[in-house]
Amino acid sequence: CCGVYATLVDRIVPGFPRKEIKDIQQKICYEDNLVVQAEIFHLWVIEAPKEIAEEFPADKAGLHVLFVPSEEPYHERKVTLLNGPHTVLSPVAFLSGINIVRDACKDPVIGKYIHKVQFEELMETLNLPKDELQKFASDVLERFMNPFVDHQVTSIMLNSFPKYQTRDLPGVKTYLERKGELPQGLVFGLAAIITYYKGGKREDGTEIVPNDSQEIMDLLKNLWATGDTQKVTDGVLSATQIWGEDLNNIAGLNALVKKDLDLIQEKGMLEAVKTIL
């Protein structure tokens, strides 16, 4: 059966295991520099007729492959409840001195922030059954806590602005539409991303090295050079090249982002995030 089918993959793949590579190569008895670390969990959703499973019986190889009429609900659930929290927890954790996703989840403050974003905000924007969403979100947290995968938050922060636009911004809009107020955690996450792109050093001396398109890097560099968080807020939210629209048109967003930026500058990330929990 020839055809082109929409697909979705779900697996956390931190990449090259720098810390463990020597031990791994010793175990396999040869030098392999193409090793990739990944979690055991995996899911491949294929939007295709059931008969395609007969042509491609991946399940018989022990693989978690689903052939479904529509991959959209799986895509929406995964992007919202896994990728969405990833995108905002990473700058909050890193600027609080935490480097690994697992450690962020265990931290009493950052862990509470992650739970707020995932269960109290993003989950409220989806239309799937509540018990199904609760189960998926709980499973995602368990995956984040995987003791065998050291998922660096800096690897997640590559191209943070485009990621926020696709993973979190829809949730901001839907939450506002349904609740009549902005989701504090998601908006704080945007302020954290903006702060991360300021660069510089953490309190422990670790370099803050954002990585995005040159256009976005130049924009944030120039905005932060003004030393004015209002100008930074105005400039980022009005950047249609990032968002495809002017986010200043979202009621209350400018004021809340500015407030969060000021809190982060004044108190530091960890103390600032406590104010919304």
Please place each PLM-identified region on the residue numbering:
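Substrate/ligand-engaging "lid" and interaction regions
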Residues: 1-277
